[in-house]
Regions:
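Short, solvent-exposed loop/beta-turn-alpha elements that line the ligand-binding surface or hinge
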Residues: 50, 103-106, 208-211, 278-287
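Pocket-lining segment of extracytoplasmic ligand-binding domains
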Residues: 84, 162, 167-259
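Secondary-structure end/capping motifs
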Residues: 225-304
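Short helix-capping segments at alpha-helix termini
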Residues: 47-51, 151-157, 195-198, 264, ...
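Bacterial N-terminal signal peptides
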Residues: 7-17
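Short, glycine-/small- and polar/acidic-enriched structural segments
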Residues: 24-155, 162-163, 179-185, 212
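Sec/Tat signal peptide C-region and signal peptidase I cleavage site
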Residues: 18-23
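Conserved C-terminal helix/tail region of periplasmic/extracytoplasmic solute-binding proteins
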Residues: 295-324
């Protein structure tokens, strides 16, 4: 799906200046099954009208790390991945900036690890040696499992993780192919559908492990933001505005998501389980969203101490992020 708006004038609601020779800019991205990113919602709401910005869906992301590979390779302008995956990619040499939180975890939106009702698994300690279905390796759910085990004094690699696409998480759990299915905070549509069928029990969630924090980020290449500073600012401000819209108008957001999913040929029914994006009001990150994972990666020896600096990674539209 390509969403195009003519370059007439900047959206007045954003309060942004318009240069006399406003060039049209195409922003390519990979979509995720079962939901919309905030920039997709922003486009549906008309927040890019008159900005000269075109956002173009060029396919589906097979997990956050694959999205970052596409971003690094130049086949998209926007990536999206769990914070730890973003930091690993930056540490490996990719000059990315974290534009805005794609989702977050709080009491309303969280990743939950489910078992069947009759499962003997009842705590983090019980997941040792068990098989857990996650959407991808090296991303949010992977690191949540590692951190949960670490906090209990257990080896971080003592559970077996297997990759299962979101639409199949319920199926593999009910069929006994895995012991646990982890439904990510961005997969609340699939979670709701699974719970509707009954017979599942939550063991733990990522807020138990991490507290309230951004779960992942929409990511831009730094060179692109320098070449297109106005467009980068518009993109972020329109997207964070859409995050607030979803918070304030959840039912309308569900209607939009359902319509777009139907247009994509996906199951529109799951949109009714959309629980929000789980981010703070205003959609802006705080440094802890990044620093928490920097500390984890340094502790694990994945990155050298001091290699990553949270403030340098966070993209700024002029509003400095808070520090806590």
């Amino acid at each position: 799906m390509t969403i195009h708006f003519p370059a007439l004038a900047l959206a007045a609601a954003l309060g942004l200046p318009l240069s006399p020779a406003w060039a049209e800019v195409n922003i390519r991205y990979l979509a995720s099954q079962g939901g919309l990113s905030a920039h997709e919602l922003a486009a549906e709401l008309g927040y890019f009208d008159g900005t000269g910005i075109t956002i173009e869906n060029v396919g589906y992301a097979q997990g956050g790390p694959a999205s970052l590979v596409a971003l690094a390779g130049g086949s998209v302008e926007v990536g999206s991945a769990a914070t730890a995956a973003v930091l690993n990619s930056i540490a490996a040499g990719n000059d990315f900036v974290a534009a805005y939180p794609s989702n977050g975890i709080n009491d309303e939106a969280q990743s939950i690890f489910y078992v069947l009702d009759d499962s003997p698994i009842r705590s983090v300690e019980d997941i040792v040696g068990k098989t857990i279905a996650v959407n991808t390796l090296g991303a949010h759910l992977d690191y949540v499992v590692r951190e949960a085990l670490h906090q209990k004094g257990l080896p971080q690699d003592s559970a077996n993780l297997v990759v299962v696409p979101g639409p199949q998480l319920e199926q593999v759990l009910r069929s006994g192919q895995v012991d646990i299915s982890a439904f990510g905070y961005w997969q609340t549509t699939f979670t709701g559908a699974a719970l509707q069928n009954g017979g599942l029990r939550a063991v733990f969630d990522d807020t138990d492990v991490l507290g309230e924090i951004a779960g992942g980020f929409i990511v831009l290449r730094r060179d692109w933001t320098l070449a297109h500073p106005d467009e980068a600012r518009i993109f972020v401000e329109a997207s964070t505005r859409a995050l607030d819209y979803a918070r304030d108008n959840p039912e309308k957001a569900r209607e939009i998501i359902a319509r777009v999913l139907a247009e994509r040929g996906e199951n529109a029914e799951v949109a009714r389980y959309f629980a929000g994006y789980g981010v703070r009001k205003g959609g802006l990150p705080v440094e802890r969203d990044i620093q928490f994972w920097i500390d984890v990666l340094e502790r694990q020896g994945a990155v050298p101490p001091g290699r990553l600096v949270a403030r340098d990674i966070l993209f700024s539209t002029g509003d400095s992020p808070k520090t806590n």
